[in-house]
Amino acid sequence: MGKFLIKGGNPLKGKIKVSGAKNAALPIITAALLADTPSKLIDIPHLRDVTNLCNILEKMGAGVEFENNIVSIDPTTLTEAEADPELARKLRASYYILGVLLAKEGWARTSLPGGCNIGNRPIDLHLKGFKALGADVKLDHGIVEVKANKLKGARIYLDYPSVGATINIMLAATRAEGKTVIENAAREPEIVDLANYLTVMGAKIKGVGTDIIKIEGVDSLKGAEHRIIPDRIEAGTYMIAAALNKGDVFVDNVLAEHLKSLIAKLKEMGIQIKEEISGIKVVSNDKLKAVDVKTLPYPGFPTDLQSQIMVLLTQAEGTSLVIETVWENRFMHVDELKRMGADIKIDGHSALIKPSQLTGAEVTATDLRAGAALILAGLVAEGETEVRNINHVERGYEDIEEKLSGIGADIRKVK
């Protein structure tokens, strides 16, 4: 299982490099199966989720090579349209197989996916989209099966701008007959990145990055080479780490336009932010101001940075308010932060944070971003912090201990 041991108080200085975006890599790797020829995908992070997905595709017969952050995929050897149920349960993104193989093979089956336990995350919107395109959908004892003789374009309104549903419907629609319109679509940069890859493959997609996406189906797609965008959540995590620890850190390989909401909040707290071509320089201030944060779908403040900024707010002067509107179980890290001395009160979907002197403690990561928050808390806490269940963290952060050590953090992984 492993754990991180962290001694707090070290100022962070230097340069830290951000990896490719996991949440872009997973749908793009799966989308490579849509093509009739191989693809080469660059800047893919070495993470457990990525490895699990590659293993799923290999078991389905696809040719997959993963080394030096490059994934090469040959879809021509694909023999199965069903994902291994044990592997699929470990990975929420395994549901993208449904949209891809429904479009290409007319049939797909997988078990209901896993991932972080941060609340009710149904795939109803995905299935509603598939049905609108003409698919038959069966859900039985945790197994999802989709079938269609020929998908036909449709106008689909999403009750909520779900990232997963937007991606899955877009994947299925690329090879459907006619035009598909997705209304109230999610606008995340990872969706734009996927659409850019699909377009190079020969797909006809317009409006990505807005709430209305239009897809004109094509008969076939060809493989392509594509470089994944930087991981904005990893970048945001390191920006917050720098702000916590009297930092003077250059966060390399960041697209600042993907982090406007975080940058605005950090500046509001009194932190110096300088946007450069290849990254963002963060210089901390001894006195941080309290701010209010409300999570929203992109381009609002990301729910995936809520737990991390909550740690930063414990070091601010004054009372801060955090309102979580995206996931209902996204405060699971709070009890662990309280073990370290954090003064946080929860009321429904809101958290009230007061200034706190954090001290080292034994804490447990309950999910990916909670784990990241506990690491950040350990970096600023007095004494030693032990973070357990780090398998959650390793699902989403490539070489996090080496990267943080490189800018002065005292962090090491032990068995």
Swiss-Prot record:
The keyword Transmembrane does not apply. InterPro entries: Enolpyruvate_Tfrase_dom, Enolpyruvate_Tfrase_sf, MurA_subfamily, RNA3'P_cycl/enolpyr_Trfase_a/b, UDP_GlcNAc_COvinyl_MurA. PANTHER family: UDP-N-ACETYLGLUCOSAMINE 1-CARBOXYVINYLTRANSFERASE. The keyword rRNA-binding does not apply. One of its GO terms (biological process) is cell wall organization. CDD domains: UdpNAET (cd01555). GO terms for molecular function: UDP-N-acetylglucosamine 1-carboxyvinyltransferase activity. Transmembrane segments: none annotated. Phosphoenolpyruvate binds at residues 22-23. Pathway: Cell wall biogenesis; peptidoglycan biosynthesis. GO terms for cellular component: cytoplasm. It comes from Halothermothrix orenii (strain H 168 / OCM 544 / DSM 9562). It catalyses: phosphoenolpyruvate + UDP-N-acetyl-alpha-D-glucosamine = UDP-N-acetyl-3-O-(1-carboxyvinyl)-alpha-D-glucosamine + phosphate. The modification 2-(S-cysteinyl)pyruvic acid O-phosphothioketal is found at residue 116. SUPFAM superfamilies: EPT/RTPC-like. UDP-N-acetyl-alpha-D-glucosamine binds at residues 92, 121-125, 304, 326. This is UDP-N-acetylglucosamine 1-carboxyvinyltransferase.
